[in-house]
Structure formats: C-alpha cells, structure tokens
C-alpha cells in the first residue's frame, strides 16, 4: 500500500464525502473492517477518483446511476450529498434519476428519488 496514494485518497474522499463522514467511518474501522477503508481510500479515491480523465462532477453523475442500478441505498444517499458537493444541482440529480428509472426500472427510479429527497430534506432542515 502506497502511503502517498493513501493520503491523497483520504484527502479527496474528505473533500467529496465530507470530513465528518470520513472521520466517523475511519474511527469506526476495526481490525476486521480497516482493510476495506484503506482499500477505498487508496484505490477508489487515490487512484480512480483522482485521475484526470473525468471531472469530479462527471464521476458523481456516473456514480448516481450505477449506485441506483445496484440498489445500494446507504451509498446512494452518501453520493447524492457528494454530487451536490461536486457541483451537481438538484435538477441535474433529478434528470439523472429519471434516466435511471427508464433504464433500470421504475422501482429503482422511485427508490432513488425517495432517497435523494430524504437527503434534500435533511439538508434543508439542518438535520444532515
């Protein structure tokens, strides 16, 4: 494991997902789960998210579609927040989720809309 990539990944993960979230995830890591956190920091964030070929905004847009299709509600809520942090508007998120509904099915779209709306309500009310 490259310490440089790990540090770069952790810094980018904090920017995109928010420092509080990442701090909680890292603090909760134990002997069993720490390798998964380190893999995410180094490979996902240090190698892939930091590549020059796509902007963070574009990567967030892609993630919304893929995570919706995979039916990963916790990760979708997290990445709706990340998408907003990376400059996507609620309108762009809505359009992405409409695209999900057409290509992944109405149930996937409905669930994704419900989860995104929960994030928006949390942000609007200061609950998140």
Region spans (language model):
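Gly/Ser/Thr-rich beta-alpha loop segments that engage phosphate groups in nucleotides
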Residues: 20, 67, 107
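Short alpha-helical scaffolding segments that buttress acidic/His motifs in well-ordered protein cores
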Residues: 40-44, 61-68, 96-101
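Short, conserved micro-motifs enriched in small and acidic residues
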Residues: 56, 60, 106-107
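C-terminal structural segments of small proteins and small subunits
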Residues: 102-112
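Residues at alpha-helix boundaries and the short loops/turns that link adjacent helices
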Residues: 16-19, 73, 87, 103
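Mid-chain, well-packed structural core segment of small domains
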Residues: 61-64, 68-94
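Acidic, glycine/proline-rich low-complexity segments that act as flexible tails and inter-domain linkers
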Residues: 1-57, 85, 111-128
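Short basic/hydrophobic patches in alpha-helices and adjacent helix-turn junctions
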Residues: 82-86, 99-102, 118
């Amino acid at each position: 494991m490259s310490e440089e990539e790990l540090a770069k990944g952790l810094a980018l993960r904090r920017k995109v997902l928010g420092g509080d979230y990442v701090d909680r995830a890292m603090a909760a890591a134990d002997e069993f789960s720490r390798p998964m956190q380190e893999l995410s920091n180094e490979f996902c964030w240090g190698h892939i998210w930091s590549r020059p070929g796509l902007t963070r905004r574009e990567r967030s847009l892609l993630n919304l579609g893929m995570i919706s299709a995979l039916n990963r509600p916790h990760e979708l809520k997290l990445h709706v927040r990340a998408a907003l942090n990376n400059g996507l508007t609620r309108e762009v998120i809505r359009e992405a989720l409409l695209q999900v509904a057409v290509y992944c099915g109405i149930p996937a779209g409905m669930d994704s809309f419900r989860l995104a709306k929960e994030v928006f309500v949390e942000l609007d009310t200061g609950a998140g």
